[in-house]
């Protein structure tokens, strides 16, 4: 590949920009503590995982053997026998959520998708793309779904086969919907377990809860039907990706034969990135679960440190149990832009992903927020 001098200079400028901002992220859930340099040589090849990793494919350059290992690992941590599961490495959390909703729609074609107003924005888009009826449910103060409102709307709609989109860590507050509570409440109104579907969006917390001492319900053992997790968030990856796992019996109803590549396919995207499979494989092979527990404990400790610092000066910061997302009042625009914070209404958050090995970046943010919020308070009082 030959670039013009101007294009070479442009690429070099972007390289230096990336180096400068490599560890900038404190407002969005993307870990930057990864090193996949051992895999760089594979970027010489067009590796395409089109189709089903468990079957033969006529496209020779695939990483199916590695994808099988990845899926076996996630079946284990999400507590479903490997032979009873199927899933794949996706392009990201939205594709995983779409896959789960697609399975649910095929199982219950005329049913309504119920999700809380704190659910990721992409779910509304998914409902439109899949032409599913949908219903937005109110949220509790901490970001969990409002269980009373959920049941009220299911009863009002006379829904016999509700499709529940459960958050295992909401985007802004890290709230985890109580899967067991949802099932109990549905049973109380006479809806049997076989008559509804629960998809779990565990984009960030899916790689936290398996490694803490007292996790909230999140897995197939707790009653879910499918789950997705992002690869670029808690795990860390230079390329956005994700993993989705579902019950094999539900996947088989959408599977189709593809003569062109001599295999079966039940994925959303068809051609899939074989390189991200290698990244996820290397990530799970290079750490033990004990090391992951230590990594998660560090992140949780940093989150609590941030809460304590805010609260020590009277700023009402908080976090949900087992969450590395710290919520606090939204500062002035120049502050949240300076630190690249995610904001929603009158709240902002910081997320203590694993590349924050010490408190320096957190302290810099907190110092600015304290000065901004306390200064605003003094100006209001003075006025």
From Swiss-Prot:
<dbReference type="Pfam" id="PF00282">
    <property type="entry name" value="Pyridoxal_deC"/>
</dbReference>
<comment type="subunit">
    <text>Homotetramer.</text>
</comment>
<dbReference type="GO" id="GO:0019752">
    <property type="term" value="P:carboxylic acid metabolic process"/>
</dbReference>
<keyword id="KW-0210">Decarboxylase</keyword>
<feature type="binding site">
    <location>
        <position position="120"/>
    </location>
    <ligand>
        <name>substrate</name>
    </ligand>
</feature>
<dbReference type="InterPro" id="IPR002129">
    <property type="entry name" value="PyrdxlP-dep_de-COase"/>
</dbReference>
<dbReference type="GO" id="GO:0004398">
    <property type="term" value="F:histidine decarboxylase activity"/>
</dbReference>
<dbReference type="InterPro" id="IPR015421">
    <property type="entry name" value="PyrdxlP-dep_Trfase_major"/>
</dbReference>
<dbReference type="InterPro" id="IPR015424">
    <property type="entry name" value="PyrdxlP-dep_Trfase"/>
</dbReference>
<keyword id="KW-0663">Pyridoxal phosphate</keyword>
<keyword id="KW-0456">Lyase</keyword>
<comment type="similarity">
    <text>Belongs to the group II decarboxylase family.</text>
</comment>
<dbReference type="InterPro" id="IPR051151">
    <property type="entry name" value="Group_II_Decarboxylase"/>
</dbReference>
<dbReference type="GO" id="GO:0030170">
    <property type="term" value="F:pyridoxal phosphate binding"/>
</dbReference>
<dbReference type="InterPro" id="IPR023523">
    <property type="entry name" value="Hist_deCOase_bac"/>
</dbReference>
<dbReference type="InterPro" id="IPR021115">
    <property type="entry name" value="Pyridoxal-P_BS"/>
</dbReference>
<feature type="modified residue" description="N6-(pyridoxal phosphate)lysine">
    <location>
        <position position="233"/>
    </location>
</feature>
<protein>
    <recommendedName>
        <fullName>Histidine decarboxylase</fullName>
        <ecNumber>4.1.1.22</ecNumber>
    </recommendedName>
</protein>
